[in-house]
Every structure is written in structure tokens, then in C-alpha cells.
């Protein structure tokens, strides 16, 4: 019988052999070729255990790798949860100091300027208090945040301008709507003490309406009024009104912000003259005055849209001694859109002759290239009075053309800034006198009543040559956009914004011929139809509540003499588009007035076409200089009193557009008379009827 050699391996040896890819054993004592098989057979149980273990081990490794990669992918897809300590704002820090919040709602910057001026003086008087100035538009990101934030206020001031026909300014509109509308909140502001200063014009019907309404609502909701509402009147000297109101405020703040044992007398305060830090530069080789770009998600006053002039034409006949321009802005491919009844804000430059005069008065070369800054060289804010936002680096000529309002009458603060830089002591004293309480009457007569411009005042005081930083921060206010009622409908002209603009050209009491900045630019504009190098302007659309009824079958009554026709041209274009689409329209009457049908009857052919097509039911015209007696739209309203009353009784909407100081007041009185007589009502009930029309949004006015 053949003998075999038994080979017994340890588990360690066998695993080593398997991992190395070979089996190591001693064959020196045998030549049997079946020894490897015998070895494996001898150790088969152990081999099976090891093989299974290796397989399980590999499987575990695979699963582990897969789970790690899956977890990593999941973490990559999910935002990591990072715990960030809550940032404690200055409002939430209770350092024992009393906090005062000063809000402003402004259209031209005056309310903001007063708010900052109050804070600057208050800081000097009450060193232990903390003051902050807040744009109402920035106070809360969402409407539901207003209540939460206001509850935390204990002392607040509101500087509120009234704009247009008793409307809030753009930056205060959202807050005003939230605060004055909606459900009653009860007396939830009992911890708040406040004061309100209004900015308006007594010539307008709704003088300081916004300030009055906010004041009433604050009291209704539990707040305590510190002083009566300040009634700033821009028709006179609004700075004097502000100064007088401040004198009522200080004693109240003394009680609230001074320690009981503080018997010191406040040091007389002299407002610092605001001044930019100015840096002069070599003009860049690629300097581009056109730094305006389109494509913003929203075009507004801070982000206007560059728009070319597509069409321009004169609307008056050659017989007219006046001028009225029809202008069309091209808004195709700009992202700008509008609705019928909206307004367009237009930024234009001062006339070249005006800029030439300003350059001479300042005494620097027109191509001086500079930048203005609101901080020091080390980045710290400039002290003293608050500064308006800076404009981009540019030449002096560009700055005077685009950013300086040099044709309006200077405010008293501007006179003081000029006085501070007058080298002639007599001139300096005279400027200080005009700005003082003692010089109030002379300021009112020599500057306000005479419509004396800033340029004229600087000409009268030639030694007053302020540096650029002072001139642009304290002397010349920022040139503001001009607003126009859009005279087209997007249903008729989706890529165009039409403007109807009367030329402003008049002699002032001082003898100066005043040329309107924007109306003159429009009259001289070069349209695309005449040149590829056409005129253009930065523009933006401001939303209006001047809208046709949502139901086209509701009757409408429109009253708009002269350029007051502008929004109604848009209304009628929209009604024509609706009619052509098969929509049933309600009755529409238009009262239009001008001097003479052969001289200034603007858009006559279009209006007749609206009547022929049924977009307009009736056109009622009044010509003030054709007959022996002058006839105006309010006279025509009286003649149509029965028709007007019947339409109002059917739910008609009544619209008025035009001059607020004259025509709109006359139309309002006539409407009151019609309601009283046709409705057989006494005066108080007629007044209530008209007021209810306004509150219901059925009596709308677009006036200036």
C-alpha cells in the first residue's frame, strides 16, 4: 500500500498562503504530486471558515464605503445647519440710555433734511440719548413687521410731506397705507410719545393731509402727542415753520431726556455747514458721462432707465404764442413697463447757458474732474451735519448740469453757507441777516416773492465763493426729476411712453426770464425720426391710483383742460382697445378746455375719432378766449349738471386732472354745488356726499 505524508497547517500559515497566492509546505521527503490536494482536503473545514470570513470582511468594507459616500452625497445636497449667535442690534442693547427714533417721508429731500437737522441739534443738547434717523421705506421689510417694531418705540418724531392730491410720498406710501387702513388695533401704542412735522403747501386743498392723518391715528391708537403738529408751508418759508416748531419741542425733550438733577442751560446751537470731502483727479482717458445702464429688476428714482426720444412734435398751431410738446420715449428692450394713468419721472440737465453762468460764479475750470465723499480718508464718517448721498465722479460741468438745482430760490441754510465763505464782511452780514428771524420779511419779499434764483443771489454776493464740497452739500439742492402724467395706454403703445408737456417760459418779478428745465429740454429734443444721435433721458415710472374702473361698463366723467387732458388720452386709448376687442363700455364724458380751438386745441383729431368710434360718448369743450365772455370747464359742468348727477347716481367715477391751485379748486366747488342742487341736499350733506365719493375711490384727482 502506498504511503502518504500528512501535512497539517496552522490557520495563520494557511491564511498567509492564501493572501500571498501560494501554499508553502515541505515536499522534500516525497515526490507525490497529489500532496497539494491532500493538504487542502486535510484542511478543508478550516479553509471554508477562512473563505467565508474573507467574503464577509470584503462585504463589510463595501457596505462601509457605500454608506460613507451616500452620507457625503446627502450632506452635499443639504444645507449645513450652522448655529450662528444672534446678532444683537443697537436697538436691543439696554445700556440705560433713552432712544429716540426720527422717521421721514420725503419726495424731494426736504423732510429728510429737517429730520437730520433735528437729530444733529438734539445730539448736541442731549448727550446721553441715542438718536437714529430712519427712512420709512426701510423701517420694515414686510408690512407685518411694522406693529412689532413700533411697539418697541418709546419716543419718535415723524417728518411727513404731503405730495400730489393729498398723497404720501413714495417712500412713506407703504407705511401710511398699513397705518391708516385695515382693522382697528385699539390703544396699542400707549408707551409711545411722539411729535409730527408736516411739509406741504397751503395753496393745495389737502394741506399737510398726511401729517394730520398720521397724528390723528397715533392718538387713536394710544400714543401721547408732545406738541401740536408742525404745519410747514412751502408757499412761504418752510424753514421758519420748522424753526418755530423746534422751539416747542426742546422744552418737552428737556423733561424727557435730561436728568432730574441736570440744571444746566443748553449751549446755543449753531448748525454746522455740511461739506463733502472732495478729491480732485486727472480725468480718465475713457471717462464716460453716460454711466447709466438698463436691465435693473425694478426701475425707480435711484435706478432710472435710459430711454431714447422716439417722436417729438408741436401740438399748438403756428398762431400760438405758447408751446406744447408731444414726446414719446422708446422703452422697447429696456424692461420698463407702465399702466394707464401712471406717471413718468424724467431726469434732464440744466441748459448750457445756465451751466455757463454757474461755472463763472464758482470760478473753477469746467473740466475740473473730482469726486465727493461722505467720509474721511480713514473711512470714518464726516462729523457735523448729515450729508446728502454723493454723486459719481465727474467733471464740474457735468455736476452742475445734472446734480445742482441752481434755478430755485435758495433756502436760508444756503444763505448761511454762502455767508461763511464770503470774503466781503458786508456781504456776509447781509446774507446772515436775510437768514435770520429779523430778516424774515425781507427774505420773503426779496427772494421768495421775487422768485429769485440761487444764481441771482450768488451774482448779488460775488465774494461768496464756497468750495465745491460746500456748494454741492449745502448751497445747491439736488436737481430733482420732473413728473408727467403719461398720456398713452400700453394697450395702444406698449413700447412707448407718451408725454404731453407745456413749455414753461415766463418772466419773474426780478426780471429774469425763467425757462423750465425739463419743458425746454423736451421742446429742443432731437427724436429718432430725425437723427440716430437722438436725445435721451433717464426715466422711471411711478405707479398711480389714477385708474379706470375695473368694470368697463361703469360710467366715467373726465375733466381735464389743457395738458390736463394727458391721462384721459391714455384712458380713451384703453377704452378704444377694449371696444375693438368686443368689450361693452359704459358712458364716458370728457370736459376739455383751452383758449381757442384754432390755436391750442391739442389732439383735436384724436378726440373726434374717439367719439366716432364710441370710445368717448360725448366731448364737451370750453374755449376761454373765443367769445365775449370767458368760458371754462366748470361752466360747462354747470350746464351739464343734470347729466353729471344722473351718472354719479349710476355709480360713475369722476376724474380731474390739471392745475391744483386754480382749476381743480373751481371744479371741486362746482361739483359740490351740483350735488347740493341736483340732489336737493343741504351744504353739509352735499359735502359729505362728495367726501364719500373720494373715500370710495370714485372721485380721483391728478393735480399739480
From Swiss-Prot:
Keywords: Endoplasmic reticulum, FAD, Flavoprotein, FMN, Glycoprotein, Membrane, NADP, Oxidoreductase, Transmembrane, Transmembrane helix. Residues 302-549 form the FAD-binding FR-type domain. GO terms for biological process: sesquiterpene biosynthetic process. One of its GO terms (cellular component) is cytosol. Its EC number is 1.6.2.4. Glycans are attached at residue 29. The keyword Secreted does not apply. Artemisinin and derivatives (e.g. artesunate), are antimalarial drugs due to their endoperoxidase properties; they also display multiple pharmacological actions against inflammation,viral infections, and cell and tumor proliferation. Artesunate may be a promising treatment for COVID-19 mediated by the severe acute respiratory syndrome coronavirus 2 (2019-nCoV) (SARS-CoV-2) because of its anti-inflammatory activity, NF-kappaB (nuclear factor kappa B)-coronavirus effect and chloroquine-like endocytosis inhibition mechanism. NADP(+) binds at residues 322, 563, 624-625, 630-634, 666. Residues 67-704 are cytoplasmic. InterPro entries: CysJ-like_FAD-binding, FAD-bd_FR_type, Flavdoxin-like, Flavodoxin/NO_synth, Flavoprot_Pyr_Nucl_cyt_Rdtase, Flavoprotein-like_sf, FNR_nucleotide-bd, NADPH_Cyt_P450_Rdtase_alpha. It is found in: Endoplasmic reticulum membrane. This is NADPH--cytochrome P450 reductase 1. Residues 100-250 form the Flavodoxin-like domain. CDD domains: CYPOR. Residues 1-45 are lumenal. FAD binds at residues 482-485, 500-502, 516-519, 704. Belongs to the NADPH--cytochrome P450 reductase family. This enzyme is required for electron transfer from NADP to cytochrome P450 in microsomes. It can also provide electron transfer to heme oxygenase and cytochrome B5. Involved in the biosynthesis of the antimalarial endoperoxide artemisinin. Acts as a redox partner for CYP71AV1 which catalyzes the conversion of amorphadiene to more oxygenated products. GO terms for molecular function: flavin adenine dinucleotide binding; FMN binding; NADP binding; NADPH-hemoprotein reductase activity; oxidoreductase activity. It is a single-pass membrane protein. It comes from Artemisia annua (Sweet wormwood).
Amino acid at each position: 500500500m502506498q504511503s502518504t505524508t500528512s501535512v497539517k497547517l496552522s490557520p495563520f500559515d494557511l491564511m498567509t498562503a492564501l493572501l500571498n497566492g501560494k501554499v508553502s509546505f515541505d515536499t522534500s521527503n516525497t515526490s507525490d504530486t497529489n500532496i497539494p490536494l491532500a493538504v487542502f482536503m486535510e484542511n478543508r473545514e478550516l479553509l471554508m471558515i477562512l473563505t467565508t470570513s474573507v467574503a464577509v470582511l470584503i462585504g463589510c468594507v463595501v457596505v462601509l464605503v457605500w454608506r460613507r459616500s451616500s452620507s457625503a452625497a446627502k450632506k452635499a445636497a443639504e444645507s449645513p445647519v450652522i448655529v450662528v449667535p444672534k446678532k444683537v442690534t443697537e436697538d436691543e442693547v439696554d445700556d440705560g440710555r433713552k432712544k429716540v427714533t426720527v422717521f421721514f417721508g420725503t419726495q424731494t429731500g426736504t423732510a429728510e433734511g429737517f429730520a437730520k437737522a433735528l437729530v444733529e441739534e438734539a445730539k448736541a443738547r442731549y448727550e446721553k440719548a441715542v438718536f437714529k434717523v430712519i427712512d420709512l421705506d426701510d423701517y420694515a421689510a414686510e408690512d407685518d413687521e411694522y406693529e412689532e417694531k413700533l411697539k418697541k418705540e418709546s419716543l419718535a418724531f415723524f417728518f411727513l410731506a404731503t405730495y400730489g392730491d393729498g398723497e404720501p410720498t413714495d417712500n412713506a406710501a407703504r407705511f401710511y397705507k398699513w397705518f391708516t387702513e385695515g382693522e382697528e388695533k385699539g390703544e396699542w401704542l400707549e408707551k409711545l410719545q411722539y411729535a409730527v412735522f408736516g411739509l406741504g403747501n397751503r395753496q393745495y386743498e389737502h394741506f399737510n393731509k398726511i401729517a394730520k392723518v398720521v397724528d390723528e391715528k397715533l392718538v387713536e391708537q394710544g400714543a401721547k402727542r408732545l406738541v401740536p403738529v408742525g404745519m410747514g408751508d412751502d408757499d412761504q418759508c418752510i424753514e421758519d415753520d420748522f424753526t418755530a416748531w423746534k422751539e416747542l419741542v426742546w422744552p418737552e425733550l428737556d423733561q424727557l431726556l435730561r436728568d432730574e438733577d441736570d440744571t444746566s442751560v443748553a449751549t446755543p446751537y449753531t448748525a454746522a455747514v455740511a461739506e463733502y470731502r472732495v478729491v480732485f483727479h486727472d480725468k480718465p482717458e475713457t471717462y464716460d458721462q453716460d454711466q447709466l445702464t438698463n436691465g435693473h429688476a425694478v426701475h425707480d428714482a435711484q435706478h432710472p432707465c435710459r430711454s431714447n426720444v422716439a417722436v417729438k412734435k408741436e401740438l399748438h398751431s403756428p398762431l400760438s404764442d405758447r408751446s406744447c410738446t408731444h414726446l414719446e420715449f422708446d422703452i422697447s428692450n429696456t424692461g420698463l413697463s407702465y399702466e394707464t394713468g401712471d406717471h413718468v419721472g424724467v431726469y434732464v440737465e440744466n441748459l448750457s447757458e445756465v451751466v455757463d453762468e454757474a461755472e463763472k460764479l464758482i470760478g473753477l475750470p469746467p473740466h475740473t474732474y473730482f469726486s465727493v465723499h461722505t467720509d474721511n480718508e480713514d473711512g470714518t464718517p464726516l462729523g457735523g451735519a448729515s450729508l446728502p448721498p454723493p454723486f459719481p465722479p465727474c467733471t464740474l460741468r457735468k455736476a452742475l448740469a445734472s446734480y445742482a438745482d441752481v434755478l430755485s430760490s435758495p433756502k436760508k441754510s444756503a444763505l448761511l453757507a454762502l455767508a461763511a465763505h464770503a470774503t466781503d464782511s458786508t456781504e456776509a452780514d447781509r446774507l446772515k441777516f436775510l437768514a435770520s428771524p429779523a430778516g424774515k420779511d425781507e427774505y420773503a419779499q426779496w427772494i421768495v416773492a421775487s422768485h429769485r434764483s440761487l444764481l441771482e443771489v450768488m451774482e448779488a454776493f460775488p465774494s461768496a465763493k464756497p468750495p465745491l464740497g460746500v456748494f454741492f452739500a449745502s448751497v445747491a439742492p439736488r436737481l430733482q426729476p420732473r413728473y408727467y402724467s403719461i398720456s398713452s395706454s400700453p394697450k395702444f403703445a406698449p413700447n412707448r411712453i407718451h408725454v404731453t408737456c407745456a413749455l414753461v417760459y415766463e418772466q419773474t418779478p426780478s426780471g429774469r426770464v425763467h425757462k423750465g428745465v425739463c419743458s425746454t429740454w423736451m421742446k429742443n429734443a432731437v427724436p429718432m425720426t430725425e437723427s440716430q444721435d437722438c436725445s435721451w433721458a433717464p426715466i422711471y415710472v411711478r405707479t398711480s391710483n389714477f385708474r379706470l374702473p375695473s368694470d368697463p361698463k361703469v360710467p366715467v366723467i373726465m375733466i381735464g383742460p389743457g395738458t390736463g387732458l394727458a391721462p384721459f388720452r391714455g384712458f380713451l386709448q384703453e377704452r378704444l382697445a377694449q371696444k375693438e376687442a368686443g368689450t361693452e363700455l359704459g358712458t364716458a364724458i370728457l370736459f376739455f378746455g383751452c383758449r381757442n380751438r384754432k390755436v391750442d386745441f391739442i389732439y383735436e383729431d384724436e378726440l373726434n375719432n374717439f367719439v366716432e368710434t364710441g370710445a368717448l360718448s360725448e366731448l364737451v369743450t370750453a374755449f376761454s378766449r373765443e367769445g365775449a365772455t370767458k368760458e371754462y370747464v366748470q361752466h360747462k359742468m354747470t350746464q351739464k349738471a343734470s347729466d353729471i348727477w344722473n351718472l354719479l347716481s349710476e355709480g360713475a367715477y369722476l376724474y380731474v386732472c390739471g392745475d391744483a391751485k386754480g382749476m381743480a379748486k373751481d371744479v371741486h366747488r362746482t361739483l359740490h354745488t351740483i350735488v347740493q342742487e341736483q340732489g336737493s341736499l343741504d351744504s353739509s350733506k352735499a359735502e359729505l356726499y362728495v367726501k364719500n365719493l373720494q373715500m370710495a375711490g370714485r372721485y380721483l384727482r391728478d393735480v399739480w
